[in-house]
Each structure stands twice: as structure tokens, then as C-alpha cells.
Amino acid sequence: MGKKDKRWVLQRKNDHYYNLAKKRNYRSRATYKLFQLNEKFNLIKERNVVVDLGCAPGGWLQAARDIVGDKGFIVGIDLQTVKPLPYENVIAIKGDMTKEEILKQARDLLPEKPDVIICDASPNISGVWDVDHARSLELTTMALMTATKMLKRGGNFVVKVFQGDLFEKYVQLVSEYFDKAFTTKPRASRDESAEVYVIGKRFNGRKFDLNSKSPIVKLLDLKPVEEEITSPSLRKEISKEDSGLMIKRIKEMRSKKE
């Protein structure tokens, strides 16, 4: 075992929330993040209907089930297979949250439109700050888009985002679809982690605007880099820093697509 592996094992052994989760048979220390977020923002209530995007390994499914009780209902969606939980009112679907057929499958299972959509998903980490921030924004924007398709009016949303140049613009984007937007870092988050949680309270019912002028939405556009650089309208909308990040992300997405 290398030095790095030994440090990781030691850190985990000394991790209060890891040990607490293990003791109480929760699948992840992240379970306590949702408990703490809910304690502070009152996102999920007893009997609520909840959708968990990127639900593997199931820690947030467990936390949500503890909150909604046996009268609520929870559907999780993840690209990975999630081991079933021993509750009739918790179901995990294997699939892509951006695909309409997967969302239809989720809707067919739900007794009504969800009261809350939660997302603790993380992108594949590269270790490069700008790239990880951009990947996080892509994932969280997809989660927001899904939330606007599924949530009932007045519903709540919580999503994990990595900090970076466009973080505040993502918060602004969330505020377009919710009466209030907040940011927070629960106690269970590690101090060294770049993760922050964005909260949207009381969904206003607006459909997601694919033509939004937000630079966050522009990140999802796969037009050639040259078009992005020379577009006068785009140049007016974003700063140099945003543009640099955008171009990096487009290049990365294009190479991945190829």
C-alpha cells in the first residue's frame, strides 16, 4: 500500500461521519449532508414525493426515506445499478436523467409530481480545477433542467456544485426558476472539498430556457470553438474569464464526442 493509500485509509478511519454512517448502516457519509441541509432549509417534509438524480450508492435515498417516512415516495435515477433498499416506497432506476424515456419511466412510478428534487452527483474528477468546475456545471445544469420538467409548482431543489469562476452565475440561473436561491456548505462536507450546495426554494413553474443568455447555458452548446470566439453577441454576454473556461469545456466535450 502506497503512502497516499495509507493516508486515505487513516483519514477515513478518523472520519466522524464515515464512522457514523457505517455504524447506522447508511451507504455513504453524504447521508448526513442531506440531513443537515434539510434541517437548515426545510426542503423535504414527511409524506413528500422526492426524486434523487445521480442517486448511487444510495445514501441520499436512505436519508430522504428517513425524512418522508412510509407515506412518502422516492425515485432515484443513476447511470449505475443501485442495490435495492428494503422499502416499497423507494425505487432506483438505471438510466440517464437527461433522456426523456427515463424521465417518463420515473413519472410513471410516481404517485404525483415531486415536491423535491435532490442531486448529490459528481462528475468524473480530473484534478484540473477549471475542467472539474466546468464538468460540474454541465451536470448541475442538466439537473436543473430536469427539475424544471418534473417539479410541482412550489417545489424545492438542492444540488451539489463545485466552486469556480461561474459558480455565482449558476446561482443566478437557479434563481430564475425559484423564488429564492441559497448557497451553503453542510458540516459533513470536508473542509478541503470545493463542493457547495445550491438550494432553490419554491419552483415558479417556468420551463427551462434553452435560449437563455446565461453563460452557463452556453457551456452546453457544442458549436465549433471558432464560432464561439468570433460571435459578437456572445462576446457581449460573457467576460474573458468565462470565455476561457467555456472554450476549454467545448474543446473537452468535442474531443470526448470524437
Swiss-Prot record:
Q: Where is the active site?
A: 160 (proton acceptor)
Q: Which residues form a coiled coil?
A: none
Superkingdom assignment: Archaea
The record's subcellular locations are: Cytoplasm
Substrates-to-products reaction catalysed:
uridine(2552) in 23S rRNA + S-adenosyl-L-methionine = 2'-O-methyluridine(2552) in 23S rRNA + S-adenosyl-L-homocysteine + H(+)
Q: Which keywords does this Swiss-Prot/TrEMBL entry list? A: Cytoplasm, Methyltransferase, rRNA processing, S-adenosyl-L-methionine, Transferase
Q: Which residues bind S-adenosyl-L-methionine?
A: 58, 60, 78, 96, 120
Q: What class of enzyme is it?
A: transferase
Q: Name one Pfam family in it.
A: FtsJ
Instruction: Identify the EC number(s).
Output: 2.1.1.166
Mention any one GO cellular component term assigned to this protein in its UniProt record: cytoplasm
Q: Which SUPFAM superfamilies match?
A: S-adenosyl-L-methionine-dependent methyltransferases
Q: Name one GO molecular function term.
A: rRNA (uridine-2'-O-)-methyltransferase activity
What PANTHER family does this protein map onto?
PRE-RRNA 2'-O-RIBOSE RNA METHYLTRANSFERASE FTSJ3, RIBOSOMAL RNA METHYLTRANSFERASE
> Which function does this protein serve?
Specifically methylates the uridine in position 2552 of 23S rRNA at the 2'-O position of the ribose in the fully assembled 50S ribosomal subunit.
Family membership, please give it: Belongs to the class I-like SAM-binding methyltransferase superfamily. RNA methyltransferase RlmE family.
Q: What is this protein called?
A: Ribosomal RNA large subunit methyltransferase E
